[in-house]
Structure formats: structure tokens, C-alpha cells
Amino acid sequence: MGDIEKQTEIREKKARNVMRELKIQKLCLNICVGESGDRLTRAAKVLEQLTGQTPVFSKARYTVRTFGIRRNEKIAVHCTVRGPKAEEILEKGLKVKEYELYKENFSDTGNFGFGVQEHIDLGIKYDPSIGIYGMDFYVVLDRAGRRIAKRRRAPGRVGPSHRVEREESIKWFQQKYDGIILPPKPKVKRTFHRRR
């Protein structure tokens, strides 16, 4: 047996290892309205209809006068979904995006996110009293054994070989959802005119 054959055999064993399989740890849904009041409560209703859970309000970290935001004012609403319900909602969101994402959507830690412009595309019936809201999807991927880093008693560290990386999460997305990774968006060149 040559070196190359041994390496391919080791790769195959790693691929079959149950502990190496990627899974969805959680799905975070976020609607940022940018103001408190009626629009924010309507956005909360949208998330409640979609997830069946009561969403949580997010507060502004500091005052921004140009946006008319005060510190500790409720400006956004978010919800964390886990388990099979998370997979079901993610499937709806990816269907809206036609299973197409950019490489920039994936982070170095193996998580990814994307946005949907209209919540009615997710299969929620349009209600004129609520209106139309867009939302952000954030997906956190992990492997079995993550708990050792999070537990209270005798916490350990997840080794670098067991951490999820960008390339692995892209491969998982392509295999599980037959996803397409789009080429990077062309960067717009800005021309600056000098004053004479």
C-alpha cells in the first residue's frame, strides 16, 4: 500500500465518521425595523406566525440622532429556532433564494446567513394590517461534541481539526440542498473627481 492509498483510506474513514457530520445547531431569524412602536409589534407577529414561538425584542446599543434612535429603545425583533422546525424554515428560506448563495454569505467559522426581502414568499398569507417585512436568516452549523466547550463543569476546548470551517459548510450546503455557489459580485469602482 502506497502513501496515497493510505491517505485516501483515512479520508474515507473520516467521511464516514458520525462525529464528523455537520448539523444545524440553530437558526436565528431577525427583523430590524429601526424604530419602536406599531411597526415593531407587527414584525413580531410575522415572526410568531412563521416560527410558532414568542420572539424577543432587541434594544439599540447607543443613540444615533441621524436615524432617530435612542439608547435602549427597542428597534428589532429576533427568534432562535432549533431542531426539525429550524430545518423546515431554512428550507423555505433557501427556496426563496432558489438555493443560490454567494461565497461571502459563509463565515470563517462555518456559519452562513442570507436575507429575504418579503416574508410572504415564505408561505405566510398576506395581511394588509401587518404589511410586508424582510428578514435575515443566520444558520449556525456544528459537529457532535460541541458541548465540551460550553458546559459549566470541566469545560474543554474543541480542537482545530474538529471545528467547522468555511469550505466544509459550503460543501455541506451543496450536498444537502443541491445548492449553487454564485461567483462574487463585481466590485463597483468609484471615481473621485478632484476639485480644480
From Swiss-Prot:
Record's subcellular location: Nucleus; Cytoplasm
One of the record's GO cellular component terms: nucleus
Disruption phenotype: RNAi-mediated knockdown results in a growth defect.
Segments crossing the lipid bilayer: none
Protein keywords: Cytoplasm, Nucleus, Ribonucleoprotein, Ribosomal protein, RNA-binding, rRNA-binding
Gene Ontology MF terms in the entry: RNA binding; rRNA binding; structural constituent of ribosome
Any single biological process term in GO: translation
The protein's role, per its UniProt record: Component of the ribosome, a large ribonucleoprotein complex responsible for the synthesis of proteins in the cell. The small ribosomal subunit (SSU) binds messenger RNAs (mRNAs) and translates the encoded message by selecting cognate aminoacyl-transfer RNA (tRNA) molecules. The large subunit (LSU) contains the ribosomal catalytic site termed the peptidyl transferase center (PTC), which catalyzes the formation of peptide bonds, thereby polymerizing the amino acids delivered by tRNAs into a polypeptide chain.
UniProt record similarity statement: Belongs to the universal ribosomal protein uL5 family.
Subunit comment: Component of the large ribosomal subunit.
Additional remarks: There's a functional difference between the two L11-encoding proteins in C.elegans. rpl-11.1 plays a role in the germline whereas rpl-11.2 has a somatic function.
Listed name of the protein: Large ribosomal subunit protein uL5B
Species in which this protein is naturally found: Caenorhabditis elegans
Lineage, top ranks: Eukaryota, Metazoa, Ecdysozoa, Nematoda, Chromadorea
Encoding gene per record: rpl-11.2
